[in-house]
Amino acid sequence: MQDLLNVLGLASSANKLISGETLFKKIIKNKIKLVLTVKDMGASQLKKINDKCAFYQVPIYNGLIDTIQLNQAIGKNNVKAIGIEDINFVKLILKNISKGDVNYGQTN
C-alpha cells in the first residue's frame, strides 16, 4: 500500500490530483482519467460520485484506502475522493493495484 500512497503524494506535488467540486466539473469535461474514493466516504457522496463516473465512463476504485492515509499522502485535509488527470500517474496507480499492493475495502 505504501507504493500507492507514494504515487498519490507525487501526483499531488505535480498538481495532477483534483478534489472537491472541481472534480465533478472535470469529470463532466472528460479531463479525469481515474477516480479513487476512501473507505469511510458517506453513502450519499459515494453514490453521487459513482453515478457521475458511470455516466461519463470514468474508471473508479472505491475503498482502497481510508481518509487518514489519503490525506497524509497528498498533504491535504478532509479529502474523500480524488481524480487523477495524468495518464502516467494512472498507469502507476493501476500497476500498484494490480500487483496486490492495496488492501481492498468494501466497494459499492
What are these regions (language model features)?
Residues D3, S44, K48, I65, ...:
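Charged, alpha-helix-enriched surfaces in structured cytosolic catalytic cores
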Residues D3-T37:
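N-terminal first-folded block
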Residues L5-V7, F24-K26, I49, Q69-I74:
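Short, flexible, solvent-exposed loop/turn segments with mixed acidic/basic and small polar residues
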Residues N15, I32-L34, Q57-P59, V79-K80:
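Short active-site oxyanion
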Residues T22, D40, I65-I68, I87:
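Short, ordered loop/turn segments at secondary-structure junctions
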Residues I28-K52, P59:
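N-terminal positively charged helical leader segments and presequences
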Residues F55-V79:
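Mid-chain, well-packed structural core segment of small domains
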Residues N71-N108:
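C-terminal structural segments of small proteins and small subunits
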